[in-house]
Structure formats: C-alpha cells, structure tokens
Amino acid sequence: MTSSEAASPGATGRPLTDFEQVLLGVIASEPRSGYGLKKMFGSSPASVYQPSPGALYPALRRLAGSGLLRAEEQVSSGRRAQRMYQVTEAGLAVHLEWLRKPVVPETVGAELGQHLMRFSLMEKYLERGEVIAFLGDLGRALDGFVRGMEEFIAARPEIMRGHALLALEHGIAIHRASREWVGTAMAALSPMPGETSPVPGG
C-alpha cells in the first residue's frame, strides 16, 4: 500500500486515500459544502492535502456513494442551493480507524506529512493518552529513521560526498527537527501532577 492510501476501506472495500480521510475528518468537525471545502483548502498554508482542480468533488461523490458521507440540499434566502455534507456513523468509524492506524517505522519518512495531519485531527476524538502514545511511536520511528540514514552515510564514505551527502544531511536535519518537535508536543500534552486527562475535544 502506498503512502497515499489509507488502511481503512470504505463500504466498497476500496482503501480510502489520505485526502479522502482528511475530508472525513474536516467534515466530521463541521458539515460543509463542496464550495466551503474548496475555500478552506485554498486558504490553508498547508499544501500537503490541497486538492488539485477537479479532485475535490469526485472525492466527495465517492465518499457519499460509499455511505461515509450524507449530502443534503440546503437553500438560504436569496442564494443558490448548496449541497451540505455530513459524516455518517460509518464514515466516523472509518475515520477513527485511520486516526488510530499504527506508525510503521519503515515508512515514517514517506508518511511524515500524513502522520502530522492525523495528529492535527486527533484532538476532537482521541483521549490525550492515545495521542501521547501515538507521538511516542512516531518519535521512536523517527529516531530509527535518523539512525538508519546516519549509518548509511557512515558505511559508504567513498560515495557519500558532494551533493549526494548534502542532500542526505538535509533529510537527517528535517527528521531530527521533527523528532525534537515530537518531544515538545509530548511535554505540552502531558498532564501536570494532579491534573486529569480531558475528554476528547476538551
């Protein structure tokens, strides 16, 4: 399965793409129209899941056809009818399964953007302990990734030089910085002594 595919299948058994999972998460937080989603993604500084022209509406239709979204026509005074999308119970179940998908150490480099997006969508639905456990797994996977890249360079001193070496060092720096962020996030989310863990969304 590629990094663009999510493990949770829809009603048709087809694995959802990460973008479709992001759509489920965004719509689960608030019913939205296709136009509203287009504006939201267009104004977001994050480019990882900005849909290409013509990709958004087919994705919404696929999710609705799979029973993961429900569409309702709404008419406001003086405005054209809008199709508002809401997540169904089946859609929410599929989305929660995706949020809880384990971090795979072997693919953490390719899937780092997906993991960060999942983290951003966890706040509403997962207990803080689950989120901290996810971050712990992510941190360990990043440690292994950085260590593996460093060992790769050390084992090939005769060819790891020039631009190739600089490019790999960039990858190491990026993932080491991500590992440092994981530690900061875990510290920020860890309860203080005597503090109880809030319910999801709290």
Model-derived regions, located:
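Non-transmembrane amphipathic alpha-helical segments
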Residues: L142-I153, H175, V182
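Acidic interhelical loop/turn segments
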Residues: G148-L168
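An accessory alpha-helical subdomain
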Residues: F134-D137, G162-S178
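Short, contiguous alpha-helical
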Residues: I172-G194
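Amphipathic alpha-helical dimerization/coiled-coil segments
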Residues: E97-R147
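Alpha-helix N-cap/N′ positions at the starts of helices
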Residues: D18-F19, Q114, H163
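Short, charged, intrinsically disordered terminal tails
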Residues: P193-G201
